[in-house]
Amino acid sequence: MSLILKFMLLILLVSSHHVRSGSIVKFLPGFKGPLPFELETGYIGIGEEENVQFFYYFIKSDKNPQEDPLIIWLNGGPGCSCLSGLFFENGPLALKNKVYNGSVPSLVSTTYSWTKTANIIFLDQPVGSGFSYSKTPIERTSDTSEVKKIHEFLQKWLIKHPQFLSNPFYVVGDSYSGMIVPALVHEISKGNYICCNPPINLQGYVLGNPITHIEFEQNFRIPYAHGMSLISDELYESLKRICKGNYFSVDPSNKKCLKLVEEYHKCTDNINSHHTLIANCDDSNTQHISPDCYYYPYHLVECWANNESVREALHVDKGSIGEWIRDHRGIPYKSDIRSSIPYHMNNSINGYRSLIFSGDHDITMPFQATQAWIKSLNYSIIDDWRPWMIKGQIAGYTRTYSNKMTFATVKGGGHTAEYLPEESSIMFQRWISGQPL
C-alpha cells in the first residue's frame, strides 16, 4: 500500500472516530517543580459505544522521541495498575519511602527510567484497574477479549498521535502479562494486513518473569526450591520418585505425594515467593502494611493516587472511579488462554525480536520454567550461555536463539524489575538498541 493511500485512510479514520484529546501534565503533587520529562495522560474509548475508557500515561523519550522506539507497558495481575510499572519498575519517577503523614507522598526522579531511550505508553488494563473505567456496569472480560481491546486502543492512540506511526513498536510487560503480550503481538501482526487499520511498525516484545503455561510452570517450583537449598535432598528425591514431576495437580489417591507436597509447603510457605531474600511481610492489606515492610510503598502509591489534587493533575474524569487500588483482584475475569507458547511460536515464525528475562530469586515463576518452554520452541542457539556484565561485574546470564529470542537472567532479581531496576534498565537499553547484552 502506498504511503499516500495509507495517509488518506488515516484521515478517514480520524474523521470517522470521536477520539478524546490527551492532556499535558507539567506538574504533579508530591514532586518539586516542573516535571523534567513530557507527560501526557488521557482516555481512549473502546467498543462501538466506547463504554470502556482505558486510561493511559504517555512519557516521551529523553533522547529522540521522533525516532526512538515506542513501547506499550502492560502490568500483570490481571488488575494491577500500570503505576506499579511507572513508579516501581521502569519509569522516571518513584515514591520517596517514608512513613505516611497524611500529606501527599513525595515523588523523586529516578536514574533507571526506560524512557531514557524509548517512548512509553503505560496502560491501565483491564477496565477496572487503575483509573480505567466503564460507563456501564463492568462485564466479565478475558485474556482474548483484552487482547482485542488493547489492539483497538493502540489503533486509536496512533490516530491521535500519527507522528509515532513510523517509530519501531514493541509490546512490553511482566508476570501475568505473559499471557497477554504474545497474543497481542500476534493480533497486531494480523491487523497490519488489514487495509483499513493504521499500520503499526511492530518489531518485537519484551517479557519479565512471564506466566506462560501455569500448569506446566508451577511444577518447576520444587526443583527451584531444591536448587536454592530450601528443601532437603531427601525430600526432593522422594518428591521426584513418588510424584513423578507432577506436584500441583496431584491425583487425590496418591496420598504419599500429597504428604510430600505438604512437607514442601512447610519449608517454603513463609518465604517471600516473589523474592526469596526479602522478608516475607504481609502486603495483602496495604492500608495496614508495616513501614518496615519492603512493600510499604504500595501503601504510599494508593495514598497518592487517591488524593483529589493528584486526580485533578492527572485529568482523571471526576466520579469515574471510587477508591484507587494498586492491584485490583476483584475484576470479573476469565483466563481463557491456557498457554501462550503457540503465540511465541507464531511470533518467531513472523520474525519478531523478543527479550525474555527472569529474576533468579523468584519462586512464583522460576527461571527454569521459562528456560524449559523456550527450549520447547526448538530453535538453535546462536550465542550460548554466558554472563552479561555491568561495570565489570556479572549482572546475570544470557543466551540467544536463531528465532531472534534472547533469554537473560537478572542475578539477584525477583518476580518484577522493581527489585533491581538499574540492572533491568541497562539490560533493556542494550537490547532495544540492538547491542548484545
UniProtKB/Swiss-Prot annotation:
- Is Cytoplasm included in the keywords of this UniProt record? no
| Disulfides per UniProt | C243-C257, C281-C293
EC assignment: 2.3.1.103
Which positions does UniProt annotate with glycan attachment?
N101, N307, N346, N378
- Chemical reaction(s) catalysed: 2 1-O-(trans-sinapoyl)-beta-D-glucose = 1,2-di-O-sinapoyl beta-D-glucose + D-glucose
Question: Per the UniProt entry, what are the Gene Ontology biological process annotations, in alphabetical order?
Answer: proteolysis
Gene Ontology MF annotations: serine-type carboxypeptidase activity; sinapoylglucose-sinapoylglucose O-sinapoyltransferase activity
Pfam families referenced in this protein's UniProt entry, alphabetically: Peptidase_S10 (PF00450)
Q: Which InterPro entries match?
A: AB_hydrolase_fold, Peptidase_S10
Which keywords does the record carry? Answer: Acyltransferase, Disulfide bond, Glycoprotein, Secreted, Signal, Transferase
The active-site annotation reads S175, D362, H415
Q: Where in the cell is it found?
A: Secreted
In the UniProt record, the signal sequence range is: 1-21
> What tissues express this gene product?
Expressed in seedlings, leaves, flowers and siliques.
**Free-text disruption phenotype from the record:** Decreased levels of 1,2-disinapoyl-glucose due to a partial redundancy with SCPL8 and SCPL13.
Please tell me which top-level EC class this enzyme sits in. transferase
Q: What does this protein do?
A: Catalyzes the formation of 1,2-bis-O-sinapoyl beta-D-glucoside and an unidentified compound 1.
Q: What family is this protein classified in? A: Belongs to the peptidase S10 family.
Name it: Serine carboxypeptidase-like 9
Encoding gene per record: SCPL9
